[in-house]
Amino acid sequence: KYAKKPFIVGYRFSPEEFETPGIRLEDTIWLLERLRETKLDYLHVSLNTYDRVAYSEKYADKTILEYVHETLQGKIPLVGVGNVRNRQDVETVLANAELVAIGQQMIVDPDWDVKMVEDRDAEFVTKPFEEAYQELYLPSPLYNFLNMRYQPSK
C-alpha cells in the first residue's frame, strides 16, 4: 500500500528442523500448497546443501529442493541455495529452482560471480569452506561466528 511499485515480497523458509518435535517436510509441503496460491513474488528455501534429502523415509527418494519445486507447480519462483560452489552446482540447482542464491562461496571467493560470467571456472576457490575462510582477513565478529559454527565435532 505504501511502497512504490515494483516492490517484491518473498518468503524464506526452513523445510525441516533437526529438533523433535519440529517442522518436517510433510508440514512444509502442506504450507507450500497454500503459499503457491498467494501473490508472493518468490519463495526462498533455506538449505545447508542443495542436494539434502529429508529425514523422513517417505520423502527420501528425491532431494528436498525437488519436492519443494514440484509442490509449487511453477506458480511462484523458487530460490534454491545450499553449498553452491561451481557451475555444475548452479546448473543442478536451476533444474529445480528459478533462481540460485550464493552465500558462503561469496565470502571465500568475492569475485566468484565475475569468474562465473567470464567462464573462469578454473579460478574458483574450491577448498572446503571450513578451511577456506580461515585463510581470509575477516572482521572479528564474522570470523568468530564461523569458527564457532564450523568447529570440529567431538
Ranges and model annotations:
Residues K1-K154:
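Flavin-dependent oxidoreductase catalytic cores
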